[in-house]
Swiss-Prot record:
Residues 152-163 have a biased composition (Polar residues). This is Cell division protein SepF. The keyword Cell cycle applies. It is found in: Cytoplasm. Cell division protein that is part of the divisome complex and is recruited early to the Z-ring. Probably stimulates Z-ring formation, perhaps through the cross-linking of FtsZ protofilaments. Its function overlaps with FtsA. Coiled coil: none annotated. InterPro entries: Cell_div_SepF (IPR023052), Cell_div_SepF/SepF-rel (IPR007561), SepF-like_sf (IPR038594). The lineage of its organism: Bacteria, Bacillati, Cyanobacteriota, Cyanophyceae, Synechococcales. HAMAP family: SepF (MF_01197). Its main location: cytoplasm. Homodimer. Interacts with FtsZ. PANTHER family: CELL DIVISION PROTEIN SEPF. One of its GO terms (biological process) is FtsZ-dependent cytokinesis. Keywords: Cell cycle, Cell division, Cytoplasm, Septation.
Length: 189
């Protein structure tokens, strides 16, 4: 180094004037085994990397909460026969825990049962779940991680539709409903 560059470094406040630097700010690689040929201590290197993961906040305070019940465990089905609407939050909690819920609402009054179905259907919709009517006053509600398939759809066949006039089976093309506004209004022309 020349005299002018040393003088410039002193005036500018260069800390590395003599090529020395403070090693206290840097971590050493003592965690790794330096005696290996490079590939023998792979698992301990991964363990050291996983411990240094900045996204792993096990002990820290994180504001992110997870969905309860997310795991690779077997699916669970909860059968509920509520007698009042007050028991419906239990069904929502079961859905949040990724459990499939079967509601048997035969023990409830019809207006309370309708209210219960609407409540649980709203909760199911909120978690992107599925709902299916299984039978008379029996409903299946499943979270998004469960696929619900229905192999039997209740669709009326053409032979089961009855005509009001001749009380016999008719095809669906004949049964086109007449609009309510045109049936009873006499023409004024």
């Amino acid at each position: 180094m020349s005299l002018i560059s040393r003088l410039r470094a002193v005036v500018a406040g260069d800390d590395y004037l003599d090529g020395d630097f403070d090693e206290l700010d840097y971590e050493t690689g003592d965690d790794f085994d330096t005696g290996n040929d490079g590939g023998g201590n792979y698992s301990s290197g991964l363990a050291a990397l996983s411990n240094a993961n900045p996204f792993n906040n096990r002990g820290g305070s994180s504001k992110v909460i997870g969905m309860p019940g997310i795991s690779t465990a077997a699916a669970e089905v909860s059968l509920m026969e509520p007698r009042s609407f007050d028991e419906m939050p239990k069904a929502i909690q079961a859905l949040r825990e990724r459990k499939t819920v079967i509601l048997n609402l035969t023990m409830m009054e019809p207006d309370q049962a309708q209210r219960a179905v609407d409540f649980v259907a709203g909760g199911t919709f909120a978690i992107d779940g599925h709902q299916e009517r299984v039978g008379e006053s029996i409903f299946l509600f499943a979270p998004s991680c469960v696929t619900v398939t229905n192999s039997f759809q209740e669709e009326p066949s053409p032979s089961s539709v009855m005509n009001k006039d001749n009380e016999g089976p008719v095809s669906e093309s004949v049964m086109a409903p007449e609009p309510a506004w045109g049936a009873s209004v006499p023409s004024a022309i």
